[in-house]
């Protein structure tokens, strides 16, 4: 991406851009790079201050990883979204580690974490923006935790399937049982058993080639109430 194009992007996404000095702007631009990630590639493992990630194309997935290897998907990022939790050095008040993977082939702009951290020390607006951006995602995180702790599996699975078809604009969730289990923080056997029940009730049909097709959206939605 050309320098002038990057400046226009930053003017749009960082409300404090015009308050930065010319030296800070130059440092900010030097610390930025366009990075291409392939599907399944790990972007941030929770140990490094990767930096702030702006999604241009594709889709990223943020999740937690338990000690026994179970993944719990927190939320996904789409074009135009920003990942602030990958800049842990900026968010010193947030102590849990998230992992970021490319769910699809993705093009992103990555702003170096150290450059942003240095700016945030001297420009309160940059620090406030980082915290507000991170906090805006905690409603998504709390929703996931609420589902895991308080909702039955049939309700959770119904919500997941309806959310997926809403995002894709299709009536089919093209995922394997293993993938669904991974995204939901469950076991494949549990998901397979629940999908078998949904199939017997005429809510969905399941095939290895096509995934899970929604047959009765109204009744599936009733399970979420």
What are these regions (language model features)?
Residues 30-31, 42-52, 70-72, 95-96:
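A short beta-loop-beta micro-motif enriched in histidine and acidic residues
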Residues 63-67, 101-103:
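A generic structural motif
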Residues 44, 56, 162-166:
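Short, locally clustered residues in the helix-turn-helix/winged-helix DNA-binding domain
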Residues 75-132:
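Cyclic-nucleotide recognition modules
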Residues 1-38, 82, 87-90:
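Cyclic nucleotide-binding regulatory module and flanking cytosolic helices
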Residues 103-104, 121-186:
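Polybasic "coupling" helices that flank or enter modular domains
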Residues 162-225:
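Phosphate-/nucleic-acid-contacting segments
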Residues 40, 50-63, 78-80:
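Glycine- and acidic-residue-biased ligand/ion/polar-headgroup-sensing regions
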